C-alpha cells in the first residue's frame, strides 16, 4: 500500500470531526441521553454512559450540557425516545460502509441514508451485506513516540486482545467491548492518553482509494456523516497519504 499512512488517515478523520464540532456535540448529547435512559445516570456503573461522557469531555463540551443530557435520559423526558438503527451499503470501488443512526423516525432516516448513498455513487445494501467485514471491538490508538512497553504492559494486564505497532510508530490496542472500560482505566492509571479511542466496527480488510475515486468516496462519507440522525460511519476505505 504505497502512500497509505494509518496516522495520516487518523488525523484526516479527526480534522473532519473537529470541523463539524457543532454537529458532533449534538450527536454526543443524543448518545448521552440514550445511554442514561438505557443504563441509568451513574457513569461509574454505566460503561456506555462513561464512554459518551468521555467523548463529550474530549470535545470540550461544558459539564452543564452533559448533566442536562443525562437528566433528560434518566428522566425519560422529551428527546430521549430514540431507537438505534444500523444501515449497510457500498461506496466507491465496492468499499463497505456501515452507518449507525439514532432516530425517532425510521422512515425519514432510511430515506436520507439511501439518498446520500445514491447521490454520491454508492448504494444502500441489505442487512448483513457488509457487517461480516468488520469486527466489533474496543480500540485505542496512540501517537508515534508513545512508550510501547508501557502501553503493552497496561493493555495486556487489563485484558486487551492485541497490541500492534506499525512502521510509523502508531500503536493500536484492540480489546473486547466488555473489556473496554477496564483497559481505559489501566491506561489512565499508567498516565497514557490515546489519540483515538472507542468501541467501533473495525474493518478486517482495507480498500485503498486514490485520485478521483478517493475524492468521490470522501464526498459520500461527508454526506452520510452530515445527516442529523447519523452517529457513526465506518468504512473499509483508507486514503492515499497525498489525499
From Swiss-Prot:
SUPFAM superfamilies: YebC-like. GO terms for biological process: regulation of DNA-templated transcription. It comes from the Bacteria. GO terms for molecular function: DNA binding. GO terms for cellular component: cytosol. It is found in: Cytoplasm. InterPro entries: Integrase-like_N, TACO1_YebC-like_2nd/3rd_dom, TACO1_YebC_N, Transcrip_reg_TACO1-like, Transcrip_reg_TACO1-like_dom3, YebC-like. Pfam families: TACO1_YebC_N, Transcrip_reg. Gene3D superfamilies: 1.10.10.200, 3.30.70.980. The keyword Transcription applies. Keywords: Cytoplasm, DNA-binding, Transcription, Transcription regulation. Residues 1-21 are annotated as: Disordered. Its main location: cytoplasm. Belongs to the TACO1 family. This is Probable transcriptional regulatory protein Bpet3099. It comes from Bordetella petrii (strain ATCC BAA-461 / DSM 12804 / CCUG 43448).
Amino acid at each position: 500500500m504505497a502512500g497509505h499512512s494509518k496516522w495520516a488517515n487518523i488525523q484526516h478523520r479527526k480534522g473532519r470531526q473537529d470541523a463539524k464540532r457543532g454537529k458532533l456535540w449534538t450527536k454526543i448529547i443524543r448518545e448521552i441521553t440514550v445511554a442514561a435512559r438505557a443504563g441509568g445516570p451513574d457513569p461509574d456503573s454505566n460503561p456506555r454512559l462513561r464512554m459518551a461522557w468521555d467523548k463529550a469531555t474530549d470535545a470540550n463540551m461544558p459539564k452543564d450540557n452533559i448533566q442536562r443530557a443525562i437528566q433528560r435520559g434518566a428522566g425519560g423526558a422529551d428527546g430521549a425516545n430514540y431507537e438505534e438503527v444500523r444501515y449497510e451499503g457500498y461506496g466507491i470501488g465496492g468499499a463497505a460502509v456501515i452507518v449507525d443512526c439514532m432516530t425517532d423516525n425510521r422512515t425519514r432516516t432510511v430515506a436520507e441514508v439511501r439518498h446520500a448513498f445514491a447521490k454520491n455513487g454508492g448504494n444502500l445494501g441489505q442487512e448483513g451485506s457488509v457487517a461480516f467485514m468488520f469486527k466489533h471491538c474496543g480500540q485505542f490508538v496512540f501517537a508515534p513516540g508513545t512508550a510501547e512497553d508501557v502501553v503493552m504492559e497496561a493493555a495486556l494486564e487489563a485484558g486487551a486482545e492485541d497490541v500492534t505497532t506499525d512502521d510509523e510508530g502508531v500503536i493500536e490496542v484492540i480489546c473486547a467491548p466488555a473489556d473496554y472500560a477496564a483497559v481505559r482505566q489501566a491506561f489512565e492509571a499508567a498516565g497514557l492518553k490515546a489519540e483515538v479511542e472507542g468501541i467501533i466496527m473495525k474493518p478486517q480488510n482495507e480498500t485503498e482509494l486514490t485520485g478521483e475515486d478517493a475524492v468521490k468516496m470522501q464526498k459520500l462519507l461527508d454526506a452520510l456523516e452530515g445527516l442529523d440522525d447519523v452517529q457513526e460511519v465506518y468504512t473499509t476505505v483508507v486514503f492515499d497519504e497525498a489525499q
